[in-house]
Structure formats: structure tokens, C-alpha cells
Regions:
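Feature recognizes metal-dependent phosphohydrolase scaffolds
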Residues: 106, 123-416
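Alpha-helical tetratricopeptide repeat
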Residues: 1-148
Length: 416
């Protein structure tokens, strides 16, 4: 339908629906507003503001892919429509596509130089984009060792005045190597580890907003990183015959919500398994506590506490939405190193779980046909197989396309 084909009656109906949608939006009823804006668009698809208004609702409900699509539609109708560029920039920024978001914010500042909000958004996006580009350039110029290989726990004793929960200690046998890499005799060492008493202790310690000694943080991260790297990218899950499995969505640093889940639903145990489906950090003020508790539970119940990686378990999102700042604030002396170590652990997280060969759990969503291994083969059906996910390379940051990207970022969008 073109603008000329829209009757006065249809236009009047569309405007009435828009007013209803605006009222719903003002009442924070975003899903209901989306429905009304959709009806308005169906009545009169020629008005770009209908699309950008719906895009704003999608942004509030974290439907960033749909928001970008609506912004694209608005700009197809009117390439000069400033709100189209702004909404698309916000959606792209939320999806971590900084280069594209930066270009759209710049376009808004050119077309509306007096828009202070747009100038501020562009400055923030530009600063973050340049910072990440600089860090990536440094990383590509040197053979950077993994942070996990550089941490020497002997340098981080538990402070004498520390009065919180303490890790248990066990004897382990390890092989030592010379500088030339030759194996030496096996040696017995003390190793701290996570037991139920420690998990119970840090649960209350964090509830009272106290921090762990950096030594214990390093121990948890080093041990969980070693554990996670042994797992496939797609983990098969069996529910205990005498127990249950609870699947939970985004917790985003809301530590007290996590405690409430365990209070109402039961704490993780050998018979009560949990699967948390990504986005553990950012936005909330206690992302570090959530992550340390989850990693501690993973060490305590390696076959009963499961963690999927989400799109917020990545560098760009953590720099944009708060986790990096939180880590640096709570551990100022070790903040940069600790944040990098968290990123290594995030990269080791599996991206999907298959429950009882029946239920597929992934943070992002299903996959585009172009992502399938056989997509370019003659007769290929464009369907991603589970074995492709099991063999997926995941020990890196998500790119703009591919299996890892879509496992974390595949927002539902309308198909033409």
C-alpha cells in the first residue's frame, strides 16, 4: 500500500490507534502498545513515526532486532526521518554493533546539531568504539598469554584480619616442569576448593554486601575456567530420576532476586539441578556476587548446575552496561586483570544445553539458514545440526555473524 492508496478513513483509524498506543506506552505497557502500533501500521503503513514508536517499545522490551527492523522500515519510507536513525542507533548499540551505531548517531548529530541527547550518545559510543579498537589492535600485535596462566596465588594470601568464609583445603598431586618443559617428579600440594560450607558462607557474606579476598576470587575463576574448558559448546543434560531441573532466565546482577529464587524454589543440590540461561551480569549492582556464587555452585555441582553464555557475557556489553565498572570499583588494585580473567571464563561457557534429548536451551534463539554448515552446498537445507553446535569454536568474543553470534544474539524478527 502506498501513501496515495491510504484512504481518509484508514488514516483516521491509524491515528486513533496511534493515540491508544501512545497512552499504553506512557503507562509502560509496552507489549500492548506494540500491538496497537502494529494495527496502526496495518491501517496506514506510510507513516514512519508509527514504526519508530513501535521500535521504541521493542527497545524497552529488549527486542533490539525488531527495533532495528522497524527503524529500517521508517527510513525506507523517509530517508530524512531523524528518529529512524536514532532508534536504529540505540538498537545497534544495545546489540554491541558499535561501528554501525556510531555511524547512525553521527548522522543524527549532523541532521540535528542542536540535539544534546544525540551528541551525548554519539560521544559515548565513539569513545567506547575507539577504546575497543585500540585494545583489539594491541591484542593483535602481541602474542598475549592468557590471564589465567599469569596468576600466581602465592602472591595473594588471605588477609589476617579477614573474618569471612574460608575455603577447605585438600591434597593434590601435580607434575612440575622445568623451564625447558621437561617433566619433573610428581609433587603433593595443598589446594583450596569449594565445598558446601563455603558456598553457604559466601551466600550470606554477599547478602551482607561484603567482598571476598582477591585470592578466593582468583581460585574460583581459575578452577571454573579449567572446568568449563573441558565441556563441549552444546552440553547434554539429564534430569535426575529422583529430582528436578529448574531453568531460569536473565538475572542481570540482581543478587537478591537469585537468593529469592533459591528460597522459593529450593537451593541447588544433588537432586535439584539448575540451568541459568545467560545474562548473569550488567545492569544490576551485584553482578560480581551473582557470578562468583554461580561459579562456586558450578564447582560444587559440576553435573548439576549449568550455565549458558548470554550476549552480556562479552567484553563490549560489559564495558557498556556496567560489569567492568563494578569489578574495577570493588577490586580497584586488581580490577583490569580480574575483568580480563572473567572474560576468559565467559568465553569458556557453553552456549547451549540439550535437556533429555528433547528441550534445546540457548540464550539467543534459532539460527538463520545462512549459518548452517551446508548452506552453500548444493541441496543443502540450511538447517543447523546439533553436532555443529557441539563442535562450535566458542573461546573468543562474538563476531557480527556465525553460530556463536546467533547463539547469543538471535532476536526474533519478522520475515518478509
Amino acid at each position: 500500500m502506498t501513501a496515495a492508496a491510504v484512504t481518509d478513513a484508514a488514516s483516521s483509524k491509524a491515528n486513533a490507534l496511534k493515540l491508544e498506543a501512545n497512552a499504553l506506552y506512557s503507562s509502560h505497557k509496552y507489549h500492548e502498545a506494540i500491538e496497537k502500533y502494529t494495527l496502526a501500521i496495518e491501517a496506514d503503513p506510510s507513516v514512519p513515526a508509527f514504526y519508530t514508536n513501535r521500535a521504541q517499545c521493542h527497545i524497552h522490551t529488549e527486542g533490539y532486532g525488531a527495533a532495528k527492523q522497524d527503524a529500517d522500515s521508517a527510513l525506507e519510507i523517509d530517508p530524512t526521518f531523524i528518529k529512524g536513525y536514532f532508534r536504529r542507533a540505540v538498537a545497534l548499540l544495545a546489540m554491541g554493533q558499535l561501528k554501525e551505531a556510531r555511524a547512525d548517531f553521527r548522522e543524527v548529530t549532523k541532521r540535528a546539531p542542536g540535539d544534546a541527547v544525540a551528541r551525548k550518545k554519539f560521544a559515548e559510543c565513539d569513545k567506547l568504539y575507539r577504546r575497543i579498537q585500540f585494545e583489539q589492535a594491541i591484542d593483535s600485535e602481541v602474542d598475549r598469554k592468557r590471564v589465567a596462566d599469569t596468576v600466581d596465588l602465592k602472591n595473594y594470601p588471605v588477609p589476617e584480619d579477614y573474618s569471612g568464609p574460608r575455603m577447605a583445603v585438600r591434597k593434590v598431586v601435580r607434575k612440575r616442569e622445568t623451564q625447558e618443559g621437561e617433566e619433573q617428579e610428581e609433587v603433593e600440594e595443598d589446594e583450596e576448593y569449594v565445598d558446601q560450607a563455603f558456598v553457604d558462607g559466601i551466600t550470606e557474606w554477599f547478602r551482607n554486601q561484603k567482598t571476598l579476598p582477591i585470592r578466593y576470587v582468583y581460585v574460583i575463576l581459575l578452577q571454573v575456567d579449567r572446568l568449563l574448558r573441558q565441556l563441549p559448546s552444546l552440553v547434554d543434560v539429564s534430569v535426575p530420576a529422583d529430582g528436578v531441573l529448574t531453568v531460569c532466565g536473565d538475572v542481570h546482577g540482581q543478587y537478591y532476586d537469585v537468593l529469592n529464587i533459591f528460597k522459593l524454589n529450593g537451593a541447588p543440590s544433588s537432586t535439584h539441578h539448575y540451568l541459568f540461561n545467560g545474562d548473569f551480569v550488567d545492569r544490576g549492582s551485584f553482578s560480581l556476587e551473582v557470578m562468583l556464587l554461580f561459579f562456586a555452585y558450578k564447582l560444587l555441582h559440576p553435573q548439576g548446575f549449568y550455565l549458558n553464555r548470554g550476549n552480556h557475557e562479552s567484553v563490549g556489553m560489559n564495558q557498556l552496561y556496567g560489569f567492568e565498572g563494578e569489578v574495577r570499583h570493588k577490586y580497584p588494585a586488581q580490577g583490569k586483570r580480574l575483568f580480563d580473567l572473567f572474560q576468559e571464563s565467559f568465553e569458556a561457557l557453553p552456549v547451549a544445553h540439550l535437556i533429555q534429548d528433547k528441550i534445546f536451551v540457548v540464550h539467543g534463539g534459532l539460527y538463520s539458514r545462512e549459518t548452517a554448515k551446508n548452506a552453500t552446498q548444493e541441496g543443502g537445507d540450511g538447517v543447523v545440526r546439533l553436532d555443529e553446535l557441539r563442535a562450535m569454536s566458542r573461546f573468543h568474543q562474538p563476531q557480527h555473524s556465525g553460530l556463536l553470534r546467533e547463539s547469543l544474539w538471535s532476536d526474533p524478527q519478522h520475515q518478509n
